[in-house]
Amino acid sequence: MLLAAVWICGVALHAQTPQPWVIGPFTRPAEGNPVITPRPESTFMDPILKKPVQWEALHTFNPAAIVRHGKIYVLYRAEDNTGVMEIGGHTSRLGLAESKDGIHFKRMGEPVFYPADDDQNAREWPGGVEDPRIVESADGMYVLTYTQWNRETYSVGIATSRDLMHWTKYGPAFLNADGGKYAQLKYKHPNDKDPSLGTPYKSAGIVTELVKGRLIAAKMNGMYWMYWGEGAIHLATSTDLIHWNPVEYANGVAVELLRPRPGHFDSSFPETGPPPVRTPAGIIVIYNGKNAVGSGDPDLGPEAYAAGEALFDAKNPANFLVQTAEPVLKPELPYEKTGQYAAGTTFAEGLVYFHKQWFLYYGCADSLVAVATAPGK
């Protein structure tokens, strides 16, 4: 989709007081956090290795969330104890947990989504399936966006389910977009300027809206919309929630809606958070920002991840309006700054509306899952 079909404008508002459109303020519950932690006793017969693995032994983090049958369900990334002791050096699978109150969870003993001997094996092994986001369609289908990682390339994968237990994988979201150029991207750090590697192709949230108290994938101008990206935040469209096309400038480069801001919490780069929410005020995009070393927010540790919010036009998802100058959630507590990413993270990926409150689920230091809540508006 070319930029000619949409338009981009707007100026960031650097306000120090809460803005009326913002979801928040977020507070952490007095008890219960972190809500999901590693369990070395959990084992799973891996279909590729053909042997039992301790699939959630080391880290459980970066959660998606959805409301189903009056409960909150969380799909969380779990890392086993294989591979090497470095970030991304283990195999990731997705576990499932359910809660009646959003804080106390009952967990499945085995992962519900994982690399297997299927047509996505080459994209998902040995790195695994990472960093999920989930939405529900109007007809009750669950659509999962996740990172496929084979330790050489990554992409946003798409999968669907009717029960959160049994999944159909469709492969990369942009597999056939623009001649397949997005399917060939090599891994690169978001700050790497080598153009041969391409645009970082991960982290995707499909736009939703509240319909009778449920967050449902929203259709605008006859299409579904998805904000995606790490390094900058981009936009894509779809007619079926499965096959997606990035919105591009006339020169074929993916449009950039949010970019790094020197002196702010997202000074190194912004990255898409949970599925955005369309409201009368506009589309609220909760996103994660990485603080730059030396040129970032002086009140936030170097390389820390914190969550902020941006607002886009409710009728034109490419029209940027405003974003928060300060994070709405940042690493402050020990469990948010202790783990395999000691610089600290409050990495938001799951957002639900439940019992007239917002529940925001986030990864802590790439190691744990926690929750913060905000009043419903």
Q: Where do the model's predicted regions map?
A:
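ATP/pyrophosphate-binding catalytic subdomain of soluble kinases
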Residues: E271
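Beta-rich carbohydrate-recognition and catalytic domains
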Residues: Q16-G127, V135-S268, V277-Y341, H355-K377
